[in-house]
A protein has these predicted regions:
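Glycine-rich, flexible loop motifs
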Residues: 5-63, 87, 91-92, 97-191, ...
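Short, flexible loop/turn elements at secondary-structure junctions
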Residues: 43, 69-71, 180-183, 205-207
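Short glycine-rich or small-residue beta-strand-to-loop segments that form or flank ligand, phosphate
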Residues: 65-66, 200-204
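Active-site nucleophile and cofactor-binding loops and adjacent substrate-binding regions
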Residues: 67-73, 94-95
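Short acidic, Gly/Ser-rich segments with clustered Asp/Glu that frequently serve as metal-coordination loops
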Residues: 72-73, 100, 206-211
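Glycine-rich loop at the start of a catalytic domain that most often binds anionic cofactors/ligands
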Residues: 77-85
Length: 283
């Protein structure tokens, strides 16, 4: 009787929004003035600045910044920050949702790295997987796959098997896994380790094909729901008070957690292969 109260509901929101008269397909206009911003650095290209300036004219924008190393990217500049109100921009979040780095510090003396180099190289060759189609022969039962979220959203249900298959893999591009020396220049009470040198595992990767397909789907959905002038089309957003906005936000967070789970699996396999115990992890 009152679809408005269900508009942002994860299960019934899509039906409610279909029942409501909607103006979501009307082309949105950019503001004449930019939202407040700050630029940190002197050698940032005009292209990167222009990308931020366009984003700052979105009706949802409340502020932005460019970091000293900012440069032009896909949509938003790399090293750019954009704050928006009650909305999310799928293309701004990016195609590799949750891409991150993860460092594990082990209790193995760092001298072992050079003394048994072949052992560590062999562990990397046998227990890491790179490329679009590489995967492990065995898969760990991770708690993330027990989450109800996979059954609540159709695209997540469809992608679950892919996510399981790609668990613990790194993909391609600039992603990597390596052993190396970690030096703490002072005692670090936050991670509970004293000053010294340690053996570490460092990895860089994201949410694999699982996150990429989520991103591609909702980028298309946002473009349909939020038409924008040509120069700003990549900034199409989803309102977080709507079903679609909530749906993407939920899927995005699951993809981020999946990326973290992949790092955990990669490090677990390597620690099991070389021995030792985990002393600290930074992600």
């Amino acid at each position: 009787k009152n679809p408005v109260q269900y508009e942002g509901h994860l299960t019934f929101g899509q039906i409610a929004e279909a029942l409501l008269s909607s103006t979501k397909t009307e082309k949105r206009q950019l503001n004449a003035l930019r939202a407040p911003y700050h630029i940190f650095g002197d050698d940032i290209t005009e292209e990167a600045k222009t990308q931020l300036y366009t984003a700052l004219k979105l009706p949802i924008s409340v502020g932005g910044a460019l970091m000293p190393d900012a440069h032009s990217g896909y949509g938003l500049p790399i090293g750019g920050v954009l704050a928006v109100e009650n909305a999310v921009i799928p293309y701004g979040v990016g195609l590799d949702i949750g891409c991150r780095m993860c460092l594990s510090i082990l209790d193995i003396p760092v001298s072992y790295l050079s003394g048994a180099r072949d052992k560590y190289e062999k562990a990397l060759m046998e227990h890491t997987k790179f490329g679009m189609y590489e995967h492990h022969k065995s898969h760990v039962d991770h708690e993330i796959f027990d989450r109800d979220t996979f059954s609540l959203i159709p695209i997540l249900k469809r992608l679950k098997d892919k996510a399981i298959k790609q668990m613990g893999t790194s993909g391609s591009g600039n992603h990597f896994v390596e052993f190396g020396e970690v030096e703490l220049l002072a005692d670090d009470p936050q991670i509970g380790l004293p000053k010294g040198k340690y053996l570490g595992i460092l990895s860089h990767s994201g949410s694999r094909g699982f996150g990429a397909e989520i991103a591609q789907y909702y980028v298309r959905v946002a473009a349909e729901q939020c038409p924008l002038p040509k120069e700003a089309q990549q900034f199409a957003w989803l309102d977080l008070s709507t079903h679609l906005g909530l749906e993407y936000w939920t899927a995005m967070n699951l993809a981020g957690d999946y990326a973290s789970a992949c790092h955990d699996d990669i490090h677990r396999r390597l620690i099991r292969a070389v021995g030792g115990r985990l002393r600290a992890r930074i992600e």
